[in-house]
Amino acid sequence: MTYKKQLELCIPRVSEKISRKFIFDTFVKLNIGYIDRIIETPLRNDSHYKRIIIRIKWDNTQNLANEIQKQLEDLKNHLNVVYDMPWFWQIYANQPQRNI
């Protein structure tokens, strides 16, 4: 496997009841690379939800990993990941905040 660290994923809004392990297991099933870290941040305006940042070392030998990265390179695009039919998460490329 060839791992390449490039793009972080963001799930902007997830119920607080969904565990980090559930998110981890869902992304492991996609077989897109090594899940390096999952960061949970509570949403400021709604304490029942959180934002998820997923750091991945991408396995670029997998077609799905390459397709996801290609789709998300344009930061306006998103993907839907179904975690429990019909429920899904909208996945975006993470845009790190800049300190000004």
Per-segment meaning from a language model:
Residues T2-R51, R55-I68, L72-L75:
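Canonical RRM/RBD RNA-binding surface and closely related RRM-like beta-sheet modules
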Residues Q71-I100:
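Low-complexity RS/RG/RGG-rich segments used by eukaryotic RNA-binding proteins and nuclear co-regulators
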